[in-house]
Amino acid sequence: MKQGIHPDYHKVIFLDSTTDFKFLSGSTRTSSETMTWEDGNEYPVIRLDISSDSHPFYTGRQKFASADGRVERFNKKFGFKSSNE
């Protein structure tokens, strides 16, 4: 590996601000805020607005928006039953 061209890669704690879920991972990002992890070591903390613990897709709270297409609009206009019903 060529010296001096790669970013500093180290372990950080990612903290989901919504659910207080924490996980330890490697990153090139750093922070002045630190926290002690379960192994007793202190790591920089990166705060996240959303993670797999709070994202609706991963938690099962996802809502599917039914976008009416041209066929659905035609069926509504002429009184045909929807193909989804």
Curated annotation (Swiss-Prot):
GO terms for biological process: translation. One of its GO terms (cellular component) is ribosome. Transmembrane segments: none annotated. Keywords: Ribonucleoprotein, Ribosomal protein. Pfam families: Ribosomal_L31. PROSITE patterns: RIBOSOMAL_L31 (PS01143). GO terms for molecular function: structural constituent of ribosome. Part of the 50S ribosomal subunit. PANTHER family: 50S RIBOSOMAL PROTEIN L31, CHLOROPLASTIC, LARGE RIBOSOMAL SUBUNIT PROTEIN BL31C. HAMAP family: Ribosomal_bL31_2. Belongs to the bacterial ribosomal protein bL31 family. Type B subfamily. This is Large ribosomal subunit protein bL31B. It comes from Macrococcus caseolyticus (strain JCSC5402) (Macrococcoides caseolyticum). The gene is rpmE2.
